[in-house]
Structures are given as C-alpha cells and as structure tokens.
C-alpha cells in the first residue's frame, strides 16, 4: 500500500501542469528589499518581500509613494530593475530624483485603463523586473467604464474589476517580482463615516504585507512668529503579514517636506529606543559624547561620519 502511494505521488510530480513541489523547495524561498530606514526594516523583518504582494494604504499626502520610492532606490543601488505604473498620471521626474530614484533607469507606464495596467504588470513580472509599484488602485478605471459617458456609473465597478483580476495576476509573482500596490483611504457615506479603500476586499485578502501609513503629528522649527511646519511624523503600522515581521506593531519616522525621511534622525530615534543612546532629560549620551537636545545630537553625527557609521553598525548588527 505504501509503495502504491509513493508511486502515485511520484507520478503526480511528473505532471508539470500541477505545479507540485515539496515544502522545502527553493521555489518557496524569497529575498527582501530594505527600505534603508532602520526602524522600518526592523518592523518588516528586513524590508519588502519579493514574490509577494505588499499593499501600502492611508490618507492622501502622508508619504505612501515616498516609501515605495525608497524600495525602488535600494533595488537600483544593487543593480536591479524597477517599474512604476502611474494610473494617477502624477509621475514627477524631479521629485523622484530627490527621493534618490535613478529616474532614467526607471520604467514608467501610464496605461489607458485598468485592463492595460494589469496586462503591463503581468508582462513586467514575467520579464523579471525586481520591483513593480502600482500607484494606485484608486486610479484604476476598467475599459468598459472609461469608454462610456461620464454619467455612466455602474455599482461597484472598480471593486468588481479588482476582485476578479487580482487573483489572475498573482501567480506571476513566481517570476520573482516584489509587487507594491498603493491605495487611498476614503470616508464612506453614511452616519458612521468609516474609512474604506476603493477596489473592494480582494486586495486585503490577497496581500501578503499590509502597511498602513498615517500622519501622527507635525514637525515644527523656529520660535514665535517664525515657527513653521517643516514636516510630520509618519506612523507606519504592519496591519497584516504572511511573511514575518512585527505584526500589528508600528514605528514613527520623521518625514521632512523638503528632504523626505530624515535618515539621521531615524537612526537616532531607533538608538534611543534600544538604549544605545541614553537620554536623560534634555541631554543625550553616546559613548564619550554628551550633547543637549535632539538637534544637538543630529549635528554631532552630521559633523562626524565615523561616529555616525559606528552608530549604524551597532543598529544593524
């Protein structure tokens, strides 16, 4: 009986259409693409996973696209290929250059409709592009809707498209791409005014990583009349994971309007949390140095590359 079962299983494995593998097969292994921000890489267990779908969602203007751009920048730094599917027609080469993205080497598509968007993504996956960003699900318009009059508005047209098309797209992740989909949060109609995402529930069902982004406070500089908002604290929460990471935990990183995420301050905050930098009131101690105020600590590391590299090594080893 055992021999019969063994023979039957062996025969099944010869049928390539069944796509059978043992659980420890290399087919199921995947690498990660880091954000390059210590607290975020810790939260996500090393970054965005390849061969998986990551959904980044939140209100408008909280840094969702910026986070995706940092993944692209890190892929390009290691010689990989990246693509941006721009359904919102918002691609700005100057802004992405400021985000350290190698713009001339980035594939940018602005499809005419939702079907064309998904077909482009499928072909890019099959071509082995390392990371593909869809910005955004909210901008997907099916061809049947796009070709009609503006008054044509069938019920749940966007959700129906995403629910039926996303499962067809995901098998192509086997070619090795990291697929990042960005979506907006909108207030639903009704007395409860709950936040929801356009595109239906399939996106959250099939996502391997679900990152929620929101603004948790402003960063001000100056005093009195000269005080102005220069950025905000970006809170990133891992709402769901099928691939490790600190599920349901969140991190807060400083985002400056002119320069994106403040990497130096991000390292400092992580070091304070891990007690590598000791804070006593307004004073901060690191090794033999003692300075006053967070800006003082930042200045210390900005003026001393060797000291900053020492801090980075402590946080990454």
Task: Please tell me what each predicted stretch does.
Residues 2-106, 122-123:
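The Walker A/P-loop phosphate-binding site
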């Amino acid at each position: 009986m055992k021999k019969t079962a063994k023979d039957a299983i062996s025969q099944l494995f010869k049928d390539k259409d069944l796509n059978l593998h043992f659980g420890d097969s290399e087919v199921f292994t995947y690498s990660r693409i880091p954000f390059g921000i210590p607290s975020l890489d810790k939260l996500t267990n090393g970054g965005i996973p390849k061969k998986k779908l990551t959904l980044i969602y939140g209100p408008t203007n909280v840094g969702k696209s910026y986070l995706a751009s940092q993944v692209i920048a890190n892929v390009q730094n290691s010689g990989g290929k990246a693509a941006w599917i721009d359904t919102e027609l918002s691609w700005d080469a100057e802004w992405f250059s400021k985000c350290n993205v190698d713009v001339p080497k980035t594939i940018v598509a602005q499809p005419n409709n939702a079907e064309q968007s998904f077909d482009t993504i499928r072909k890019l996956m099959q071509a082995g592009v390392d990371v593909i960003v869809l910005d955004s699900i909210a901008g997907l318009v099916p061809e049947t809707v796009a070709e009609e009059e503006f008054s044509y508005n069938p019920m749940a047209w966007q959700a129906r498209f995403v629910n039926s098309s996303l499962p067809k797209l995901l098998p192509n992740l086997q070619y090795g791409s990291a697929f990042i989909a960005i979506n907006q949060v909108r207030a639903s109609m009704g007395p409860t005014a709950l936040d929801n995402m356009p595109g239906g529930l399939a996106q959250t069902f099939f996502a391997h990583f679900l990152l929620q982004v929101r603004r948790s406070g402003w960063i001000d500089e100056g005093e009195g009349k000269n005080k102005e908002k220069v950025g905000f604290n970006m809170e990133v929460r891992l709402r769901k994971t099928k691939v490790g990471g600190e599920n349901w935990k969140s991190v807060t990183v400083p985002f400056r309007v002119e320069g994106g995420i403040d990497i130096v301050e991000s390292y400092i905050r992580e070091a304070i949390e891990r007690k590598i930098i000791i804070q006593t009131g307004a004073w901060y101690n690191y090794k033999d140095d003692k300075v006053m105020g967070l800006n003082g600590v930042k200045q210390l590391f900005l003026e001393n590359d060797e000291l900053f590299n020492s801090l980075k090594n402590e946080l990454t080893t």
